[in-house]
Protein backbone atom coordinates (compact mmCIF):
# COMPACT_ATOMS: atom_id res chain seq x y z
CA UNK A 1 0.00 0.00 0.00
CA UNK A 2 1.29 3.43 -0.92
CA UNK A 3 0.98 6.42 1.37
CA UNK A 4 2.34 9.78 0.48
CA UNK A 5 5.13 11.38 2.41
CA UNK A 6 2.66 14.11 3.37
CA UNK A 7 0.46 11.59 5.19
CA UNK A 8 3.42 10.08 7.03
CA UNK A 9 5.13 13.25 8.12
CA UNK A 10 5.12 14.12 11.78
CA UNK A 11 3.73 17.44 12.74
CA UNK A 12 3.57 19.43 15.91
CA UNK A 13 0.31 21.01 14.76
CA UNK A 14 -2.01 18.86 16.93
CA UNK A 15 0.11 19.52 20.01
CA UNK A 16 0.32 23.22 19.23
CA UNK A 17 -3.40 23.36 18.59
CA UNK A 18 -4.14 21.49 21.82
CA UNK A 19 -1.90 23.81 23.84
CA UNK A 20 -3.41 26.90 22.22
CA UNK A 21 -6.92 25.64 22.92
CA UNK A 22 -6.04 24.88 26.53
CA UNK A 23 -4.48 28.33 27.00
CA UNK A 24 -7.49 30.00 25.41
CA UNK A 25 -9.83 28.07 27.71
CA UNK A 26 -7.80 28.97 30.79
CA UNK A 27 -7.70 32.66 29.81
CA UNK A 28 -11.41 32.73 28.99
CA UNK A 29 -12.27 31.16 32.34
CA UNK A 30 -10.05 33.50 34.35
CA UNK A 31 -12.16 36.03 36.18
CA UNK A 32 -15.16 33.71 36.08
CA UNK A 33 -17.25 33.33 39.20
CA UNK A 34 -20.13 30.91 38.95
CA UNK A 35 -22.71 29.68 41.42
CA UNK A 36 -23.59 26.00 41.38
CA UNK A 37 -26.95 25.32 43.03
CA UNK A 38 -27.54 21.64 43.61
CA UNK A 39 -29.87 19.34 45.51
CA UNK A 40 -28.48 18.63 48.95
CA UNK A 41 -29.26 14.94 48.53
CA UNK A 42 -27.59 14.72 45.08
CA UNK A 43 -24.08 16.20 45.36
CA UNK A 44 -22.78 13.89 42.62
CA UNK A 45 -24.43 16.02 39.92
CA UNK A 46 -22.32 19.02 40.89
CA UNK A 47 -19.20 16.84 40.91
CA UNK A 48 -19.96 15.49 37.44
CA UNK A 49 -20.31 19.03 36.12
CA UNK A 50 -17.19 20.47 37.75
CA UNK A 51 -14.64 17.65 37.67
CA UNK A 52 -13.60 18.03 34.01
CA UNK A 53 -12.87 21.74 34.52
CA UNK A 54 -11.11 21.10 37.83
CA UNK A 55 -8.92 18.45 36.19
CA UNK A 56 -7.97 20.91 33.45
CA UNK A 57 -7.21 23.67 35.94
CA UNK A 58 -5.15 21.12 37.90
CA UNK A 59 -2.64 21.13 35.05
CA UNK A 60 -1.62 24.65 36.02
CA UNK A 61 1.18 25.16 38.51
CA UNK A 62 -1.18 26.89 40.95
CA UNK A 63 -3.18 25.46 43.85
CA UNK A 64 -6.87 24.59 44.04
CA UNK A 65 -8.46 25.88 47.25
CA UNK A 66 -11.54 24.23 48.74
CA UNK A 67 -13.29 26.19 51.52
CA UNK A 68 -15.61 23.60 53.00
CA UNK A 69 -18.03 24.12 55.90
CA UNK A 70 -17.76 20.73 57.61
CA UNK A 71 -16.68 17.86 55.44
CA UNK A 72 -13.06 17.00 54.90
CA UNK A 73 -11.99 15.97 51.42
CA UNK A 74 -11.06 12.33 51.19
CA UNK A 75 -7.56 11.69 49.87
CA UNK A 76 -8.90 8.65 48.01
CA UNK A 77 -11.69 10.71 46.40
CA UNK A 78 -9.26 13.41 45.24
CA UNK A 79 -6.98 10.81 43.64
CA UNK A 80 -9.79 8.77 42.07
CA UNK A 81 -11.33 11.96 40.65
CA UNK A 82 -8.14 12.70 38.76
CA UNK A 83 -7.36 15.86 40.70
CA UNK A 84 -3.73 16.59 41.57
CA UNK A 85 -3.40 15.64 45.23
CA UNK A 86 -0.28 17.78 45.58
CA UNK A 87 -2.13 20.92 44.42
CA UNK A 88 -5.36 20.63 46.40
CA UNK A 89 -5.61 22.70 49.60
CA UNK A 90 -8.56 22.60 51.94
CA UNK A 91 -9.72 24.77 54.78
CA UNK A 92 -12.60 23.12 56.60
CA UNK A 93 -14.77 24.13 59.53
CA UNK A 94 -14.96 27.63 58.08
CA UNK A 95 -17.91 29.64 59.38
CA UNK A 96 -20.22 30.69 56.52
CA UNK A 97 -19.75 34.38 57.34
CA UNK A 98 -16.00 34.04 56.70
CA UNK A 99 -16.27 32.10 53.43
CA UNK A 100 -16.97 35.11 51.21
CA UNK A 101 -14.14 37.18 52.66
CA UNK A 102 -11.74 34.22 52.41
CA UNK A 103 -12.74 33.56 48.80
CA UNK A 104 -12.13 37.20 47.83
CA UNK A 105 -8.70 37.25 49.46
CA UNK A 106 -7.68 33.89 47.96
CA UNK A 107 -8.87 34.74 44.44
CA UNK A 108 -7.05 38.07 44.51
CA UNK A 109 -3.65 36.54 45.39
CA UNK A 110 -3.18 34.70 42.10
CA UNK A 111 -1.89 31.66 43.99
CA UNK A 112 -4.95 29.57 43.08
CA UNK A 113 -6.29 28.48 39.71
CA UNK A 114 -9.67 27.90 41.35
CA UNK A 115 -11.30 28.70 44.68
CA UNK A 116 -14.39 26.73 45.67
CA UNK A 117 -16.52 27.88 48.58
CA UNK A 118 -19.79 26.69 50.08
CA UNK A 119 -22.47 29.28 50.85
CA UNK A 120 -25.90 28.76 52.37
CA UNK A 121 -27.44 32.01 51.12
CA UNK A 122 -27.58 33.73 47.75
CA UNK A 123 -25.02 36.46 47.18
CA UNK A 124 -25.94 40.09 46.72
CA UNK A 125 -24.92 41.76 43.46
CA UNK A 126 -22.24 43.67 45.36
CA UNK A 127 -20.78 40.48 46.86
CA UNK A 128 -20.77 38.78 43.46
CA UNK A 129 -19.08 41.83 41.88
CA UNK A 130 -16.37 41.72 44.58
CA UNK A 131 -15.70 38.05 43.81
CA UNK A 132 -15.55 38.70 40.05
CA UNK A 133 -13.13 41.59 40.52
CA UNK A 134 -10.89 39.47 42.78
CA UNK A 135 -10.96 36.59 40.27
CA UNK A 136 -9.94 38.96 37.46
CA UNK A 137 -7.08 40.40 39.51
CA UNK A 138 -5.84 36.91 40.42
CA UNK A 139 -6.53 35.43 36.97
CA UNK A 140 -8.55 32.71 38.71
CA UNK A 141 -11.90 30.94 38.70
CA UNK A 142 -14.33 30.93 41.62
CA UNK A 143 -17.14 28.49 42.29
CA UNK A 144 -19.83 29.13 44.86
CA UNK A 145 -21.43 25.86 45.84
CA UNK A 146 -24.91 26.27 47.25
CA UNK A 147 -26.78 23.17 48.38
CA UNK A 148 -30.55 23.48 48.64
CA UNK A 149 -33.22 21.12 49.84
CA UNK A 150 -35.42 19.65 47.12
CA UNK A 151 -38.57 21.39 48.39
CA UNK A 152 -36.82 24.79 48.38
CA UNK A 153 -36.20 24.54 44.64
CA UNK A 154 -39.81 23.74 43.82
CA UNK A 155 -41.10 26.87 45.63
CA UNK A 156 -39.34 29.42 43.47
CA UNK A 157 -39.52 30.13 39.79
CA UNK A 158 -36.26 29.69 37.91
CA UNK A 159 -35.47 31.36 34.64
CA UNK A 160 -32.92 29.53 32.64
CA UNK A 161 -32.02 27.50 29.66
CA UNK A 162 -33.03 23.87 29.37
CA UNK A 163 -30.46 21.79 27.57
CA UNK A 164 -31.99 18.87 25.76
CA UNK A 165 -29.81 15.92 24.95
CA UNK A 166 -30.41 12.98 22.67
CA UNK A 167 -27.98 11.09 24.86
CA UNK A 168 -30.78 10.13 27.23
CA UNK A 169 -33.72 9.87 24.79
Curated annotation (Swiss-Prot):
<dbReference type="GO" id="GO:0009432">
    <property type="term" value="P:SOS response"/>
</dbReference>
<dbReference type="InterPro" id="IPR027417">
    <property type="entry name" value="P-loop_NTPase"/>
</dbReference>
<keyword id="KW-0717">Septation</keyword>
<dbReference type="InterPro" id="IPR004596">
    <property type="entry name" value="Cell_div_suppressor_SulA"/>
</dbReference>
<dbReference type="GO" id="GO:0051782">
    <property type="term" value="P:negative regulation of cell division"/>
</dbReference>
<keyword id="KW-0742">SOS response</keyword>
<dbReference type="InterPro" id="IPR047696">
    <property type="entry name" value="SulA_enterobact"/>
</dbReference>
<comment type="similarity">
    <text>Belongs to the SulA family.</text>
</comment>
<dbReference type="Pfam" id="PF03846">
    <property type="entry name" value="SulA"/>
</dbReference>
<keyword id="KW-0131">Cell cycle</keyword>
<protein>
    <recommendedName>
        <fullName>Cell division inhibitor SulA</fullName>
    </recommendedName>
</protein>
<dbReference type="GO" id="GO:0000917">
    <property type="term" value="P:division septum assembly"/>
</dbReference>
<dbReference type="GO" id="GO:0006281">
    <property type="term" value="P:DNA repair"/>
</dbReference>
<feature type="region of interest" description="Lon protease binding">
    <location>
        <begin position="162"/>
        <end position="169"/>
    </location>
</feature>
<keyword id="KW-0132">Cell division</keyword>
<comment type="function">
    <text>Component of the SOS system and an inhibitor of cell division. Accumulation of SulA causes rapid cessation of cell division and the appearance of long, non-septate filaments. In the presence of GTP, binds a polymerization-competent form of FtsZ in a 1:1 ratio, thus inhibiting FtsZ polymerization and therefore preventing it from participating in the assembly of the Z ring. This mechanism prevents the premature segregation of damaged DNA to daughter cells during cell division.</text>
</comment>
<dbReference type="InterPro" id="IPR050356">
    <property type="entry name" value="SulA_CellDiv_inhibitor"/>
</dbReference>
<keyword id="KW-0227">DNA damage</keyword>
<feature type="site" description="Essential for degradation by Lon protease">
    <location>
        <position position="169"/>
    </location>
</feature>
<comment type="subunit">
    <text>Interacts with FtsZ.</text>
</comment>
<feature type="region of interest" description="FtsZ binding">
    <location>
        <begin position="106"/>
        <end position="112"/>
    </location>
</feature>
Amino acid sequence: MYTSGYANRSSSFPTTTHNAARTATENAAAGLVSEVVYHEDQPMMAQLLLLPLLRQLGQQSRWQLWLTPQQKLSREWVQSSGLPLTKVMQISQLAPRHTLESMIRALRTGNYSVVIGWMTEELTEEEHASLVEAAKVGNAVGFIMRPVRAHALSRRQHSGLKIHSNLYH
